[in-house]
A protein has these predicted regions:
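Glycine-rich phosphate-binding loops of nucleotide-dependent enzymes
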Residues: 85-92, 96-335
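Intrinsically disordered, low-complexity segments enriched in small/polar residues
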Residues: 7, 39, 57-59, 79, ...
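Intrinsically disordered, low-complexity segments enriched in proline/serine/threonine
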Residues: 8, 41, 67-70, 77, ...
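Intrinsically disordered, low-complexity regions
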Residues: 1, 5, 19, 70-73, ...
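ABC-family P-loop ATPase nucleotide-binding domain
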Residues: 43-97, 326-335
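Transmembrane alpha-helices and adjacent helix-loop boundaries
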Residues: 1-65
Length: 335
């Protein structure tokens, strides 16, 4: 219940004797104003405001790593005590299968994701792309086949163990903690590769800096972020674990042209910094400009694998997206 000062309450009471029901109108207006200006609630709006007021200035606050620590924080692709081959496959899948009852969602898929590349995983809806990612990072167990990462077998490992080996992941739908700050959301991803809270916060802020959210936005409440900011926050959360391989599941979904170009630029820079990227996406015009190689799934099977210029012309790929009947009609019209 909203409490009024004695003077204001007395004035409303006097006004209520002149205009019956005016108190309800005032309360209604107050509620509408709060809903419009602070939909998350007054407490969380004040909390965000205070967080911004007390946020350390970039480069001078408690989060800023001292000079000796920068080298250990900035190269997020650093393999945490392991070595990564300079060339060849970083991730290798051999005859990987995952079924749900009688449905083969991933049907004996064999493919390599080479170190240092941006690898696109494409296919129509229901092709098995996200299921493949879920099998790679341990959310789902493979029924058969083998998965190796930098020479280490991942088959059968739990998600947190896969993450510790150096694989980060984003998801189709961003699951933020809406009443926590952006920094607090990202710190959660940093704990897997840190030994203290202070180190986790440094890793998180470095990751936020890489995606352009390190200043005041780091202390904003996550529930008030735009779609682009949510996507970048989740990308930073994955980067905070210092992965060697990033699995991006429709990171470009829901973005306008300018926002999409910004995110593409960030992904390219992450790759130039040494992180291998595998990305699922339906925005083909963006993917063709972004990736080095395509793997195409349809009904769980790998139907094409190669350079973008070759894959987009592949008859099997076109048929998978548009359907056999459309292809036949197109051929008839040409004939």
């Amino acid at each position: 219940m909203v409490k009024l000062s004695p003077t204001l309450g007395r004035k409303l009471a006097e006004l209520g004797s002149i205009i019956p029901g005016i108190q309800g109108v005032v309360y209604g207006i107050a509620i509408i104003v709060i809903i419009l200006l602070a939909p998350e609630g007054i407490y969380w709006r004040v909390r965000e405001w205070l967080a911004r007021r007390t946020a350390p200035i970039k480069g001078t606050g408690a989060w800023a790593p001292a000079a000796p620590n920068v080298a250990s924080v900035v190269p997020i692709a650093e393999p945490r005590g392991q070595t990564t081959p300079a060339e060849g496959p970083l991730l290798r899948l051999q005859a990987v299968r995952r079924t749900f009852g009688g449905l083969r969602a991933v049907d004996d898929v064999t493919l390599d994701i080479n170190n240092g590349t941006i690898h696109g995983i494409i296919g129509p809806n229901g092709a098995g792309k996200t299921t493949l990612f879920n099998v790679i990072n341990g959310f789902l167990a493979a029924d058969s086949g083998n998965i190796t990462f930098a020479g280490t077998t991942l088959t059968g490992l739990k998600p947190h163990d896969v993450c510790r080996h150096g694989i980060g992941r984003t998801f189709q739908v961003v699951r933020a903690f809406p009443r926590m700050t952006v920094l607090e959301n990202v710190v959660i991803g940093a704990f897997v590769g840190s030994t203290s809270n202070a180190e986790a916060e440094r890793l998180a802020m470095t990751a936020l800096d890489r995606v352009g959210l390190a200043d005041e936005q780091a202390y904003a409440i996550a529930g008030g972020l735009t779609t682009k900011q949510l996507r970048l926050m989740e990308l930073a959360r994955a980067l905070a674990s210092r992965p060697r391989l990033l699995l991006l599941d429709e990171t470009l979904a829901g973005l306008g042209h300018d926002a999409l170009e910004d995110v593409l630029r960030i992904i390219r820079q992450i790759n130039r910094d040494g992180v291998t990227v595998a990305i699922i996406e339906h925005t083909m015009h963006a993917m063709v400009k972004l990736v080095d190689r395509f793997s195409v799934l349809d009904h769980g099977k790998l139907i094409a694998d190669g350079a973008p210029a070759d894959v987009v012309k592949d008859r099997t790929v076109i048929e998978a997206y548009l359907g056999r009947k459309w292809m036949e009609r197109a051929q008839d019209s040409v004939a």
